[in-house]
Amino acid sequence: KAASESRERVCKDWGLTEDMLPYFQTLHSMAYHAGGFKSSDIISKDDLDEIGDKVGLPFSAKSKGDTDFDMLGISQGDVYLNLYHLARSKKIDLEELYSQEANYDIQWSLLLRLVDAYENFKRVRGKIDFTDMIEEFVRRDSPLDIDALFVDEAQDLSTLQWEMISILRQTPRIQIFTGDDDQAIMGFQGADVKAFQNCTPNKEVLTQSFRVPQKPYEIANDISNRIRGRAPKIWHPTEHQGSVRWHNHFEEIPLETGEWCLLARTNRIVSQCANKLRDEGWVYSRFGHPSIPPKAYDAINSWEAWMKGHSLDVQSIKNIYAYMDANVGYRKGYGPRSKTFLNREEDILFSMDQARSELGLCAMEGRWHEVLGKIDKDTKHYILNALRRGDNVKKPRITVSTIHSMKGGECDNIIVIPDLSPAAYKAYRKNPETEHRVFYVAVTRTKGTLHLLSPMDTKGRYYEI
């Protein structure tokens, strides 16, 4: 998505067409096209489920992803396979990585069984994964006929991807790498920070930030100075002073106005914060979706309009019926997918009385939370609280996200949750550099005020900002 948006922006700004930029793409996309692969060649969610059944490891993989890591979920099979992908990305022996990770929840013998079944499945079925594409590109050692090479976010490239880059570097006269080793937070996908730092002796530091105000800059600078082995660099904040505010409790954060983004280390911690927002009736966005489903909100508005005497089109009525129970909201046989609606013209309007006589409506007049029975009690309570606050339900002012997902983003008000997962805290105590970089990224997302919340974890597992 990021590559597509960047390509569209460049074409618009420079008056180009997309076919003039055939190599403006991710490394995986480049390797995919160079290898002549088809989408059906790529190992799928169903394939992983089949492999998991054979070895007794459940998967919760996603149906789509831009990398092998993106595809994986959080089930046992995903955790095992993630370790194998990481070893390949880092170009190190699997047993060596297994010893380094020291994750005693992973059985070595079962890991070997999974890897054997995985590779055998790909071989027999003629399947590949995203890492195979890069490995094949490297094996063929066939550079592109290009004059210039621009590599963005280069600090996140894995050791294997740097091997692909070394092939791409064979022909172009102009070579530019952009990135920030202080923001190298993709170590869990094999990011090779040293390779980025050593990719060229000719370095230029962009010294002026156009986002980070002065007060948050002080926090950011303090964190980055803790990173051992970082490339020395001096940069300056904007002229705006901004502010840093500390909060002991979640409920103290003044969310009433303005744009907000809440950042946490893991999805589990994000979910805990999202539940707090929900309890307070705040509408928020997560994964690009509002916390109140738009169709449910449309059904509520449509019903309220119907109650006030307005007439509705067929699509609006079908949407209302989708949240009603049969024989309570509408007569059996008149559901939203019934024949009753098949041949109805979409632009014809029906009053509530007409719907009772022609479309099977049987719900008596009442408020939406009394008639839309398929919206559960807790959700009704949440929506009622949210509507009282009067926020824009379809375009929430508040976003919740992991720090990794927000990389590259910005917001006026950034809330940073310092809590760490047990695994991240264990790694933090052993090697803090990863968490320094992660929380440096978090605090530099703000354009105005940085809000720092006291730890919620009762066992002392948090990052010390």
What are these regions (language model features)?
Residues E304-L453:
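Conserved helicase C-terminal RecA-like lobe
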Residues D13-L21, G36-E50, F59, L144, ...:
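Short, polar/flexible loop-turn hinges at active-site or ligand-entry regions and domain interfaces
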Residues A31, I42-D68, T171-A184, T200-S209:
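Conserved phosphoryl-transfer catalytic core
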Residues D19-G35, W282-K308:
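Conserved beta-strand -> loop -> alpha-helix junction used to position metal-binding or nucleic-acid-contacting
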Residues A61-F150, T159-M164, G187:
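Accessory N-terminal region flanking or inserted into the helicase ATPase core
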Residues K1-S40, N221, M406, T444:
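P-loop NTPase Walker
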Residues S243-G258:
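Conserved interdomain hinge at the start of the Helicase C-terminal
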Residues S4-E5, Q25, A148, Q155-Q241, ...:
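Conserved helicase motor core of SF1/SF2 NTP-dependent helicases
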